[in-house]
Amino acid sequence: MAIIKRGARNKTAQEPAKRSAKIKKATYDSGKKKEVGVSDLTLLSTISDEAINENLKKRFTNGTIYTYIGHVLISVNPFRDLGIYTDAVLESYKGKNRLEVPPHVFAIAESMYYNLKAYNENQCVIISGESGAGKTEAAKRIMQYIASASESNSESIGKIKDMVLATNPLLESFGCAKTLRNNNSSRHGKYLEIRFNNQFEPCAGNITNYLLEKQRVVSQIKEERNFHIFYQFTKGASENYRQTFGVQKPEQYIYTSAAGCTSVDTIDDVKDYEDTLKAMQVIGLSQDEQDQIFRMLSSILWVGNISFVENEEGNAQVRDTSVTDFVAYLLQIDSQVLMKALVERTMETSHGMRRGSVYHVPLNIVQATAVRDALAKAIYNNMFDWIVERVNISLQAYPGADKSIGILDIYGFEIFEHNSFEQICINYVNEKLQQIFIQLTLKSEQETYEREQIQWTPIKFFDNKIVCDLIESRRPPGIFAAMNDSVATAHADSDAADQAFSQRLNLFSTNPHFALRSNKFVIKHYAGDVTYDVNGITDKNKDQLQRDLVELIATSSNAFLRTIFPDNVDKDSKRRPPTAGDKIIKSANELVETLSKAQPSYIRTIKPNQTKSPNDYDDQQVLHQVKYLGLKENVRIRRAGFAYRQVFDKFVERFYLLSPSCSYAGDYTWQGETLEAVKLILKEASIPEKEYQVGVSQVFIKTPETLFALEHMRDKYWYNMAARIQRAWRRFLQRRIDSATRIQRAIREKKGGNKYEKLRDEGSKILAARKERRTMSLLGFRAFMGDYLLCNERKSRGAYIKKQAGISDKVVFSIKGEQLQSKFGRSSVRVKKVLILTHSHLYIIGQSMVQNSVQYTTEYKIDVNKIAGVSMTNLQDDWVAINLSNSTQPDPLLHTFFKTELVTQLKKLNGRIQVKIGTVIEYQKKPGKMHKVKSQVSEATPKYNDNYKSGTILVRRGHPANSPQKKKPKKGKGHSKHHSTSTSAPRSSVQSSQPSAPVSRKTKKPAPPPPGSKKLSSSVAQTASRPQPVANSARGAAQPQATPQPAQVTQPQQKKVAPPPPPPPPMQSSEPKYEAAYDFPGSGSPSELPLKKGEVVYITREEPSGWSLAKTLDGSREGWVPTNYVVKHQGGSVPPPPPAPAAVQATQAANVTSTPVSSSQSETATTATPASVAAAQPNFSDGLASALAARANKMRVESDGEDNGNDDDDDDDW
């Protein structure tokens, strides 16, 4: 199946939205033109002819001439250049559907070209409207767009496109003229087919010509002109032509000056003549062919200057024989033979099957003038037909045409003061086009809905078939048939034929669309009533050249003249030659048949005034056109109907890619009925049922937006498939790289050990068995990773802090901690800080709330080379003082869980640093003033933390100072085989226990938790998501955390085991109870706990920022609440908490790092309630992260409790 790629969309100047953004930021487009009225008449609130007219008037006044009725384009002639056909405008419509851009003729052309490629169906555009409404201009713009859109590097293709465009100036020159209503009125009809090859490049073309108005060659209405070419030639002819063909100015010729208009302000005849010559060259007309064309034009002009006078017998004779002599020279015939053919008529009698006598009948002046004009009309008409055929020969030079786009540019509906045979032919063709529009857009559409059993409310409309039958019908005879009968009855006498035709018109008196007047008749066309003159109408219908003129031309030595005239008519043939009426009926029906084989587009043109003024808008005239074009009915049917319909097979063939059930890898895989495939496609493409209906054999899409959505999804299918293949390949390559990395790491560790573990061992050496050790420090999983806040990553909290602090160097160590700060009139307090160490400086960064957001600023910037030493106690506390040398700043006293790693990193950067370990910490509280902080063993302190009180650090007894580091445990059996590995940050050999880079990784979906665990785990996630009041954390590594709750552990699917028995009910919490003083609905954040006034909760932690961590009495919900919204509960009956939920396996206990646990650990795990988990001694094999989380939360609860009751200021020396 061919892949159809729609043209690229134009990119805007703004940056693409982030992937996480749902809606792009709105921006003001100052260049966009303000919308006036509605761009689609189906959006009108009131559907009436007056409302349509008013909307068109608003847009015309604003310089907006295009409006839609669904897919039908309404065009109002602006009578001025609006600058809307430039190359830039044309480019903006490429690859766009009509809803993405304003209404324009380019949008219709783009739709046709896209449908040709997408559906491989012939396309055509029917441009209709009255004379002067802008049909020819619309046809030219469609050709301009298609030539530009069908880009090709082929020289032959480019030549065809140039030829197609060149047909415009050539056929305009020979087929258009200035009329009272239009300065460039088409006086013929043409249907141009642009044919395309399999690559949808224009490779051929064909033009069909319809009924040239040859009467204009010899006579025009006052202030009108002959065909443009006569004025171009007489004004712009070269000196060679003037000498050879005797070319004069247009004022010297009767055929160009009789109407009194030889120049038009808006027409440059000389320039247009040059364009015509260029077009002839592009199409391929040789110089000899061009010379012969201009010879014929000269002969026509000079034939018009032949005049007659009466001789003595009252017959006509040529006034000036020099004129006939020059005409004979141009036509290359004998002068005497020419004069005789003009003033005499040859008659031949017959007797049965035998020929009779031949008579030469002299003509009077009127008859001789008619013969002269007939000769001029015949030469021009036959030459025009030859030019069209010659163009077709050039356009057919390149074979391979498969599909086509047809452009119909035909004369518009005409109503003059005197209307004759030409007008009835023109108006008849317009009736046929109106009938096509009715058949395809109104009648056929409603019949299709009824046949397909689609829900539909019928709409009444006028079917003009009765008018078409009145003109073209043979049985019963129509007007053309009656005309032919009259000619056959009295073929020798035109007046008698007119009289016979007038009598036959009585046959139509009962037709409601016909009325008879004296010597005239009225046909009620769809565009209005037109009165036609009977006099002379039958003679124009004969369309036969007098026998004498045919024989005259046959004597010419000019090969071109003989070529453009057909062979002599067989005199013995008894068959009646076809009349002009027969030809126009045949041409019209062939046109209808051609159009019915293509998918039509419609352009309805409207003429706003009769004065050709760019500022006038004649409401009555436009309202009349709105009514006879049937725009109101079109709007009503469009609003009630469906924008697209297609038979099941073609719809499935087009869109089966959108359904995974019907396709795989681009192949059609559905084995069932096509009807079921249609329903699956629409369902799996998420098309609402109200947007389509499924009939008996077709599917109907209601709105064009839905169709465009389907087309867009289909266009994106191939790109999505390519992206999937690319993702799979990249995933494979990354897995291979990660595997190689793991192998390399394992080899390096085998040879030289892990660098992070080496750094840890070096830290143990620095302590030199002088400081008691914590349990967590001795774990085998412990490794000195350094950048725990991930400051070196691109998108992380640490990177944000680093940017705000103005740090540009690479970070070697980062952690959240606390600093002891003295407050005037208060005890020294522990203030949260961020510690960042680079190769040259140690940064102590503070944080503050500014407009509800955390801001980070550098408070201390310490040069590493100016650090003289560090001071620590010999107990297991986490305090360390940074002793500065010759500094005007006080020495900072810091608290951090990773104090040994900080000291090790400082010692590595500056080997001169002295590490002081004793019973006290000595530091400069003020510059030049030493202060000592004592340490004391207290078993009443929190198990995983220490307390600072009145210059003394209270801490439990730790492991002996000479305790050895435990060996790193082996990986568990349940470790994921294909876990993701990030190479962007350093990792230890056991990645599951250490903080890692913030790289999004997809892991296997964990096993579903037992009942009751979901609520508990969600509360932890909610609490951890709020940035302001959450305790210090480094992605869950060795930092204070909220009270741990059972949570899901991201681990491989393991074998199900029988659940343990439920635990006993939880003990009554000893935490203080508070009561909500006000309603707190919350802001919608999952980290907040909404409260109702009077609701009692536990407060587990208070923050200086004004937030408190609360949880409900039953422990099912936990979150942050404003501290000033709750007050101490004064007692009273509080309902007991409900029974504890079902037991949760220990492997699903709180684990903020989602550490995988080995299968052996999982099998020996025990159950625990949230309270018991917090208090339980962590098992070494449970991993560092779980133990750190439990330690941090327990420490925070106990530390806060003691600090709240401490009001003494023993440490204040201010």
Curated annotation (Swiss-Prot):
<feature type="region of interest" description="Disordered">
    <location>
        <begin position="1"/>
        <end position="21"/>
    </location>
</feature>
<dbReference type="GO" id="GO:0043332">
    <property type="term" value="C:mating projection tip"/>
</dbReference>
<feature type="binding site">
    <location>
        <begin position="129"/>
        <end position="136"/>
    </location>
    <ligand>
        <name>ATP</name>
    </ligand>
</feature>
<dbReference type="GO" id="GO:0051666">
    <property type="term" value="P:actin cortical patch localization"/>
</dbReference>
<dbReference type="GO" id="GO:0005524">
    <property type="term" value="F:ATP binding"/>
</dbReference>
<dbReference type="Pfam" id="PF06017">
    <property type="entry name" value="Myosin_TH1"/>
</dbReference>
<dbReference type="GO" id="GO:0031097">
    <property type="term" value="C:medial cortex"/>
</dbReference>
<feature type="region of interest" description="Disordered">
    <location>
        <begin position="1129"/>
        <end position="1177"/>
    </location>
</feature>
<dbReference type="GO" id="GO:0000146">
    <property type="term" value="F:microfilament motor activity"/>
</dbReference>
<dbReference type="GO" id="GO:0030479">
    <property type="term" value="C:actin cortical patch"/>
</dbReference>
<dbReference type="GO" id="GO:0071933">
    <property type="term" value="F:Arp2/3 complex binding"/>
</dbReference>
<keyword id="KW-0518">Myosin</keyword>
<feature type="compositionally biased region" description="Low complexity">
    <location>
        <begin position="1037"/>
        <end position="1057"/>
    </location>
</feature>
<dbReference type="GO" id="GO:0000147">
    <property type="term" value="P:actin cortical patch assembly"/>
</dbReference>
<keyword id="KW-0505">Motor protein</keyword>
<dbReference type="Pfam" id="PF00063">
    <property type="entry name" value="Myosin_head"/>
</dbReference>
<feature type="domain" description="Myosin motor">
    <location>
        <begin position="36"/>
        <end position="715"/>
    </location>
</feature>
<keyword id="KW-0677">Repeat</keyword>
<dbReference type="InterPro" id="IPR010926">
    <property type="entry name" value="Myosin_TH1"/>
</dbReference>
<feature type="compositionally biased region" description="Acidic residues">
    <location>
        <begin position="1200"/>
        <end position="1214"/>
    </location>
</feature>
<keyword id="KW-0378">Hydrolase</keyword>
<dbReference type="InterPro" id="IPR027417">
    <property type="entry name" value="P-loop_NTPase"/>
</dbReference>
<feature type="compositionally biased region" description="Pro residues">
    <location>
        <begin position="1058"/>
        <end position="1067"/>
    </location>
</feature>
<feature type="region of interest" description="Disordered">
    <location>
        <begin position="1193"/>
        <end position="1214"/>
    </location>
</feature>
<protein>
    <recommendedName>
        <fullName>Myosin-1</fullName>
    </recommendedName>
</protein>
<keyword id="KW-0206">Cytoskeleton</keyword>
<dbReference type="GO" id="GO:0016787">
    <property type="term" value="F:hydrolase activity"/>
</dbReference>
<dbReference type="GO" id="GO:0005628">
    <property type="term" value="C:prospore membrane"/>
</dbReference>
<keyword id="KW-0728">SH3 domain</keyword>
<dbReference type="InterPro" id="IPR036072">
    <property type="entry name" value="MYSc_Myo1"/>
</dbReference>
<dbReference type="InterPro" id="IPR001609">
    <property type="entry name" value="Myosin_head_motor_dom-like"/>
</dbReference>
<dbReference type="GO" id="GO:0007015">
    <property type="term" value="P:actin filament organization"/>
</dbReference>
<keyword id="KW-0547">Nucleotide-binding</keyword>
<dbReference type="GO" id="GO:0006897">
    <property type="term" value="P:endocytosis"/>
</dbReference>
<keyword id="KW-0597">Phosphoprotein</keyword>
<dbReference type="GO" id="GO:0045160">
    <property type="term" value="C:myosin I complex"/>
</dbReference>
<comment type="function">
    <text>Type-I myosin implicated in the organization of the actin cytoskeleton. Required for proper actin cytoskeleton polarization. At the cell cortex, assembles in patch-like structures together with proteins from the actin-polymerizing machinery and promotes actin assembly. Functions as actin nucleation-promoting factor (NPF) for the Arp2/3 complex.</text>
</comment>
<feature type="compositionally biased region" description="Low complexity">
    <location>
        <begin position="981"/>
        <end position="1000"/>
    </location>
</feature>
<feature type="domain" description="SH3">
    <location>
        <begin position="1069"/>
        <end position="1131"/>
    </location>
</feature>
<dbReference type="GO" id="GO:0044853">
    <property type="term" value="C:plasma membrane raft"/>
</dbReference>
<dbReference type="GO" id="GO:0000281">
    <property type="term" value="P:mitotic cytokinesis"/>
</dbReference>
<feature type="compositionally biased region" description="Low complexity">
    <location>
        <begin position="1157"/>
        <end position="1177"/>
    </location>
</feature>
